[in-house]
């Protein structure tokens, strides 16, 4: 997996900052301070300045940041100034919910292909995208210039699906299965295990009651 010098937590906060700036643009706000951004997203102003400093100098001391300019810079940093084509493997409840979420398009992500092995649902559509058999994976990745794969299959099938995605040329994978996956060094892998997030909540709840 690729290792980045910039902390992952910083990248996640940049995404939150960009969403907040988008909200300010919609409200007609033209300038904003680091303190106002901090108050809006729930971090310290020092943290905002530190996160932005990884990527250069923004804004004017004593004036703040031009909202639209900073928003545009953050989109570019996050790679959201271009379109990314996605393939979803697994069109069950989780895969279907992912495919139907409208927020991805606004952030630069297009669901370009959906695949499954269940003949009962192959041929049906999710938000205008036809569910196709897994055998077409390589063809669709090439045709549609797909760079991101989303895995929402049962754990036993997850590694096999990962191997197929890697072999087809997909360079980034979002894994919703609980399986620990292996990928080559040039493939970016992110795991999203919902149970882990619930366990994190349970830890803090228990900690507060000790």
Swiss-Prot record:
Coiled coil: none annotated. NAD(+) binds at residues 90-95. Keywords: Cytoplasm, DNA-binding, NAD, Repressor, Transcription, Transcription regulation. It comes from the Bacteria. Belongs to the transcriptional regulatory Rex family. This is Redox-sensing transcriptional repressor Rex. One of its GO terms (biological process) is negative regulation of DNA-templated transcription. Residues 16-55 bind DNA. Modulates transcription in response to changes in cellular NADH/NAD(+) redox state. Transmembrane segments: none annotated. GO terms for molecular function: DNA binding; DNA-binding transcription factor activity. One of its GO terms (cellular component) is cytoplasm. It is found in: Cytoplasm. The gene is rex. Homodimer. The keyword Glycoprotein does not apply. Gene3D superfamilies: NAD(P)-binding Rossmann-like Domain (3.40.50.720), Winged helix-like DNA-binding domain superfamily/Winged helix DNA-binding domain (1.10.10.10). Pfam families: CoA_binding, Put_DNA-bind_N.
